[in-house]
Amino acid sequence: FGIGRRSEAEGRELCKIAYPITYSAEDLDFFSGAGLYDSYSAKKDNDKKTIENAIRKVWASLWNWRAFDERSYFKIDHRSCAMGILVHRSFPDEDANGVLVTRNLYNQNPGFIINVQYKEYSIVFPEPGILHDQIMLFAWSINPEQNFTPEYLSFSNVPALNGERVLSDAELEELGDYCMMIKNYYYNNVPHSCNCPFIDFGLDIEFKVDSEVSPRKIYIKQVRPYL
């Protein structure tokens, strides 16, 4: 509700709110649970897409068949599970979507892996022949005014980009700064099972880039341990 009130004060109204989920049998050392549950959106002045209906549907997805079957396979007591709901504004016409992992998955050089794609093109389930930008964002720079050095591992071939990159160098720098702060906080303040040095501590960070209600900016959508 705070998001809606603020946007009205700015003269622009966010009419849709999304309800992703998290729950107590997720991101365990032996069980991720990612993708098993459902997210729904609510829309202002829509009799069918009400907040109440969205919450009920999210809660009900705790008992969808794929989630039940997966928990059973890993011998998780269904009665021990509880679900929480993350509420955020929806992004009906995002400029970019992406995922960042806060460790180098390829070698020992400090850095992040970024997978980002134009608009709502899927990274996880891409259309045949469609590639996304993958960037190794090294956590150092020979430029004293920058903290990171990007190295592209693949390039998006979405025709609408006309060969341009999904994120600008300035946005990559900004995203790196945000995620380094998040990594520092989680490593030092949030209990975790990673008995590892800071360089090897991995978080999976989902982000959006959007310009619907303000000038183009980065939104951190979700943070979870990288398993």
Predicted regions and their residues:
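Conserved catalytic alpha/beta cores of large enzymes that bind or transform nucleotide phosphates
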Residues: V116-E212
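Compositionally biased, intrinsically disordered low-complexity regions
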Residues: G4-R6, R12-E13, L100, I113, ...
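Core catalytic machinery and nucleic-acid-binding channels of phosphodiester-processing enzymes
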Residues: L86, S90-F91, N97-T102, Y178-I182
